């Protein structure tokens, strides 16, 4: 359990400092005339380079590579979860200009005709990796760092790891609207109100015409060589020859101003005008030739551009020598910009700017003092900004930068804000807006529905499918009942229909939608969450609300506000398997499980995206959301346990019903499962979640939905299913609206009145209206279970539900029984609970084994039932008694292990020996680690990760090997170590790109080093 200290930040505020004209959304900000306060704080430095490139366009990558070849140290950060955002994000892949193949990068991408997004993205990844250039995805710039002489000295970026500083001598701004140059104080023309011209590309649709809407069908069709089979097993795809027409629409959209809210609405208008039920794909981004150009050091007025001789000062802001604008926002004529914005045309300019930026950096000394300037304004909303400022990883921080106290603009005020438009978030926005609340839903993706749509899990696996979920399923099906794309059952769907269904439901109810927005923090006053701090492509600000619904899936906003949370740490490395799928147009179900991914660790997310493109390099495209089944979870007023689920616990404040088997995708940790494994996939459990489990302890004005809710990790497999979370989100949206209308804090809404409404639509069974808490079980019931437990562990869930009284009843029965077999049952249960009562019986039972029984290897997809053998459980139970007398017995079997032995046997030995913690256990563990193939599975860098990751979409070999090495190394370290091998393994994994291994290894080193160190939040 962690508590993230409440950090009062000041970052994006400086993004709004330099000049009143620094932001495209300045008009909207001026009208609001409200600001939020950020106290002084320190921003961790993640990178210190010569050249930082902001943006992941083709030209941006070309600039980064050329700067590196010129001797500069370079870092690049992309806005999207991929590189090539100028062509892949806008879907502008078509070109007739052969001159773009004059550059090597252009030739690789376009030389063989119309490229696939996968080819573009992977080519750009490899261009940076091959040149040893660090880069990240999904990060927005929020601030400019300023040197002691007042010049730009780098940037601050924001992502799901928080905010980090990047110190740099020169900046290449390759964002479409030159947002970094604007932050640095560069001057731009005016973005006039009225009709503005945008372009938007879709795939598979019928050509439409309407006032202000014209379209052209590209001559060359999109060709798919593979099609998804929709199966979890096998490769998941088959060979095919499928072709789609692509349409580029030109749209005249009425823009109120150049504010972010205007651009967000423009995207929704474009989708309103172009979507139809035959659409199989669409661009993420609107394309516009920016009308408000940079005021540069030079002006290019000609229509034609000579790529070799155009003066680079056209791309430099006036009076700012170390910033370049590498986009259509440069000081170009409209015709010249239009020419350069054709796919690939800017590559050569990027190369020239990269070389020049490196040369300028070579003339500049490193700044001794770098900071983020603040600005004070009036009309401040009381409160302060809470955010996560731990760096990409604490161990990688390269110092800190002071961010002066400042103010952030209020970008909007709503009754309800939903941060995250995924499985629970989109329904929450529907629920709130349909109740009449002024609602805003924000999402980093450019579509709603989360894992069930963009995440490519387009069919249900179990789940409570009544209630609001049934309304959704029927609504999606009825969008076009006779369309041949229609699915056969309500349990699966056309992914873009569901995305569009949620979008229309929210807009029809009056709700607002902002895509392409990161939630980076919370605005808090005395424990009351008053709004969400957001990073947009145009800068950073605050959106205020009466109630915030945190549907990020990782409790990002709640944790930023100060909530405690649980995740992998020094005590636990258990996490459900994850994947990242390929994505062809019209795919709806590409379920993968080949790794672990920590969504909140941007290095890990980056690693997963890079590797996934290698695994699926022949496919049309890669997914945009990691398929994670388990994430960090906040600590709420109540935490749902495994035994609450197994015992059918009822609550007076039930908010959602959940129906599923224990789909664990890996091994479990709760002692109950070590004794009585989860049932097979066909055995479903009906479980309930109380409203208290969605309310972060100690905070008001916020509720958390989905995977970020307060529950033990082993309970999550039952309560994470999509149908259940859709119902949950809708209910919480209703609750948030009611809280506003009654001027209440959401914690105190009339839950019984809400339950009645949910019962009416069948989201909840009627009995919840009269349910009371059925915990704890009576002692009489526990005693009865203690007698029956000897019969195949009958009643074990009752005994362990109330652990303290359960131990008492078990101990009594252990001493009363004269039956040796029964005595062993009690001894095994008590041992698992850390009680030493039956240690002799456990040792005797283990000694009856000459060799190992049938064990278990790590399994992700399709993992049900036991993850340890009976002998494994005896050994773990013996170890947990902490009796040293068990060591010879455990070591005897440890010496029989071979590299081919099952993973569960290694894990059992490790847990037993490390729990006893005696130095006698060290050498046997060392001997195991010295066996061939047991060590050497760390992935410290991306090239190693690419080399070690097999191609299969459900690979488990890397996890079996890495987990085995890490768990054995941990146990060796905790037994006192041998030849420093345990320490070495933990240190190696503390640098692993895979976030959960990093967290675990780092946590073990901190918790068990015996040395007092500065506390670092992991």
Describe the residue ranges of each PLM region.
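Structural detector for internal amphipathic alpha-helices that build alpha-solenoid repeat scaffolds
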Residues: 791-802, 812-816, 821-836, 856-883, ...
């Amino acid at each position: 359990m962690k508590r993230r200290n409440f950090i009062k930040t000041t970052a994006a505020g400086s993004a709004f400092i330099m000049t009143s004209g620094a932001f495209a959304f300045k008009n909207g900000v001026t009208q609001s005339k409200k600001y939020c306060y950020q106290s002084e704080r320190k921003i961790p430095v993640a990178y210190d380079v010569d050249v930082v490139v902001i943006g992941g366009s083709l030209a941006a990558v070309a600039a980064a590579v050329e700067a590196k070849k010129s001797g500069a140290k370079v870092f690049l950060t992309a806005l999207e979860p991929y590189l090539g955002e100028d062509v892949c994000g806008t879907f502008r892949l078509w070109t007739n200009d052969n001159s773009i193949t004059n550059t090597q990068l252009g030739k690789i991408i376009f030389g063989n005709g119309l490229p696939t997004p996968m080819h573009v993205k992977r080519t750009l990844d490899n261009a940076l990796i091959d040149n040893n250039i660090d880069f990240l995805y999904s990060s927005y710039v929020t601030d400019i760092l300023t040197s002691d002489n007042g010049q730009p000295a780098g940037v601050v970026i924001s992502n799901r790891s928080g905010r980090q500083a990047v110190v740099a001598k020169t900046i290449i701004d390759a964002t479409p609207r030159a947002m970094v140059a604007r932050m640095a104080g560069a001057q731009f023309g005016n973005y006039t109100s009225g009709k503005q011209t945008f372009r938007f590309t879709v795939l598979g649709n019928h050509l439409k015409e309407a006032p202000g809407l014209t379209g052209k069908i590209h001559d060359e069709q999109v060709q798919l060589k593979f099609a998804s089979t929709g199966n979890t097993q096998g490769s998941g795809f088959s060979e095919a020859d499928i072709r789609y027409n692509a349409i580029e629409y030109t749209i005249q959209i009425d823009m109120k101003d150049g504010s972010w809210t205007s651009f967000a609405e423009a995207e929704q208008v474009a989708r309103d005008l172009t979507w139809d039920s035959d659409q199989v794909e669409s661009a993420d981004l609107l394309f516009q030739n920016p009308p408000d150009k940079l005021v540069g050091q030079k002006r290019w007025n000609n229509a034609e551009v000579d790529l070799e001789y155009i003066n680079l000062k056209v791309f430099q802001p006036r009076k700012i020598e170390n910033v370049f604008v590498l986009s259509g926002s440069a000081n170009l004529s409209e015709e010249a910009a239009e020419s350069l914005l054709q796919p690939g045309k800017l590559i050569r300019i990027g190369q020239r700017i990269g070389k020049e930026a490196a040369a300028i950096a070579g003339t500049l000394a490193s700044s001794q003092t770098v900071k983020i300037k603040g600005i004070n304004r009036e009309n401040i909303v009381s409160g302060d900004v809470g955010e996560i400022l731990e760096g990409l990883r604490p161990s990688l921080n390269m110092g800190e930068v002071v961010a002066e106290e400042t103010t952030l603009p209020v970008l909007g005020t709503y009754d309800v804000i939903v941060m995250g438009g995924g499985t629970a978030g989109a329904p929450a926005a529907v629920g709130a807006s349909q109740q009449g609340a002024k609602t805003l839903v924000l999402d980093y993706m450019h579509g709603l529905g989360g894992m069930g749509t963009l995440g490519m899990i387009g069919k249900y696996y179990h789940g409570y499918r009544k209630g609001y979920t049934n309304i959704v399923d029927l609504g999606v099906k009825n969008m076009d009942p006779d369309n041949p794309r229609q699915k056969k059952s309500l349990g699966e769907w056309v992914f873009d229909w569901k995305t569009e269904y949620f979008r229309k439901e929210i807009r029809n109810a009056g709700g607002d939608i902002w895509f392409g927005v990161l939630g980076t923090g919370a605005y808090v006053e005395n424990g009351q969450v008053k709004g969400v701090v957001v990073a947009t492509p145009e800068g950073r600000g605050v959106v205020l609300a009466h109630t915030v619904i945190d549907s990020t899936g990782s409790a990002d906003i709640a944790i930023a506000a100060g909530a405690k949370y649980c995740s992998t740490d020094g005590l636990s490395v258990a996490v459900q398997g994850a994947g990242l799928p390929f994505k062809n147009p019209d795919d709806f179900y590409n379920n993968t499980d080949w790794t672990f991914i920590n969504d909140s660790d941007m290095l890990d997310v980056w690693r997963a995206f890079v590797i996934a493109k290698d695994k699926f390099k022949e496919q049309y495209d890669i997914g945009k959301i990691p398929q994670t089944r388990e994430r960090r979870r906040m600590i709420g007023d109540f935490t749902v346990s495994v035994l609450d689920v197994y015992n059918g616990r009822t609550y007076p404040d039930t908010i959602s019903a959940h129906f599923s088997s224990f789909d664990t995708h890996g091994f479990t940790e709760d002692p109950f499962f070590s004794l009585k494994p989860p049932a097979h996939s066909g055995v479903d459990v009906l479980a309930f979640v109380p409203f208290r489990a969605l309310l972060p302890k100690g905070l008001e004005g916020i509720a958390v939905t989905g995977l970020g809710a307060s529950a033990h990790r082993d309970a999550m497999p039952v309560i994470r299913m999509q149908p259940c979370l859709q119902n949950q989100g809708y209910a919480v949206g209703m609750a948030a609206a009611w809280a506003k209308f009654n001027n209440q804090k959401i914690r105190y809404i009339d839950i019984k009145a809400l339950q009645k409404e949910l019962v009416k639509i069948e989201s909840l069974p009627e009995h919840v209206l009269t349910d009371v808490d059925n915990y704890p079980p009576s002692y009489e019931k526990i005693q009865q279970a203690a007698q029956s437990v000897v019969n195949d562990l009958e009643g074990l869930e009752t005994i362990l539900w109330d652990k303290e009284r359960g131990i008492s009843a078990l101990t009594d029965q252990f001493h009363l029984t004269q039956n040796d077999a029964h005595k062993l049952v009690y001894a095994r249960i008590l041992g698992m609970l850390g009680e030493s009562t039956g240690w002799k019986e456990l040792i005797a039972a283990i000694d009856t084994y000459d060799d190992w029984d049938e064990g278990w290897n790590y399994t992700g997809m399709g993992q049900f039932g036991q993850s340890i053998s009976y002998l494994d459980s005896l050994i773990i139970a013996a170890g947990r008694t902490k009796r040293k007398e068990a060591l010879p017995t455990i070591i005897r079997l440890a010496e029989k292990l071979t590299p081919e032995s099952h993973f569960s046997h290694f894990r059992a030995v490790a847990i037993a020996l490390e729990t006893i913690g005696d130095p006698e256990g060290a050498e046997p563990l060392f001997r195991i680690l010295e066996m061939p193939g047991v060590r050497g599975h760390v992935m410290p860098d991306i090239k190693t990760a690419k080399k070690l990751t097999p191609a299969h979409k459900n690979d488990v070999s890397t996890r079996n090997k890495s987990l085995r090495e890490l768990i054995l190394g941990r146990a060796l370290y905790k037994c006192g170590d041998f030849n420093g091998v345990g320490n070495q393994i933990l240190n190696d994994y503390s640098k692993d790109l895979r976030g959960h291994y990093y967290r675990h290894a780092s946590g073990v080193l901190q918790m068990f080093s015996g040395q007092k160190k500065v506390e670092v939040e992991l």
